[in-house]
């Protein structure tokens, strides 16, 4: 086990550190999505945790409460797509 092993071990530690830094950076970022022309907006962080939800009163219909749920799901899906896009771009720069 010569210098090749030591070099690989050093590279692995560097990649691990870069990955942890990337993960910490991603957690601090915010990703937003909206639906219904902005009637519902959702913000998540890089760990996909819900940070904020905004619902405009215009979409609150007591006769059809499912509308809000549908808009929420669509807004969350848009925010998650933004997060996935960012993660994909970050992984493109990783050597593995």
Curated annotation (Swiss-Prot):
* Membrane-spanning residues: none
Keyword list (alphabetical) reads:
Cytoplasm, DNA-binding
- Record keywords: Lipid metabolism included? no
The places in or outside the cell where this protein is found are: Cytoplasm, Nucleoid
Specify whether Glycosyltransferase is a keyword of the entry: no
Enumerate the Gene3D superfamilies for this protein.
Nucleoid-associated protein YbaB-like domain
Where does it sit, as one GO cellular component term?
bacterial nucleoid
One GO term in the molecular function aspect is: DNA binding
Under the heading PANTHER family, the entry gives:
NUCLEOID-ASSOCIATED PROTEIN YBAB (PTHR33449:SF1)
Query: What family does the Swiss-Prot or TrEMBL record give for this protein?
Result: Belongs to the YbaB/EbfC family.
Task: Tell me, in a sentence or two, what this protein's role is.
Answer: Binds to DNA and alters its conformation. May be involved in regulation of gene expression, nucleoid organization and DNA protection.
- Record's subunit section: Homodimer.
For this entry, the protein name equals Nucleoid-associated protein TC_0612
Which organism's genome codes for this protein? Chlamydia muridarum (strain MoPn / Nigg)
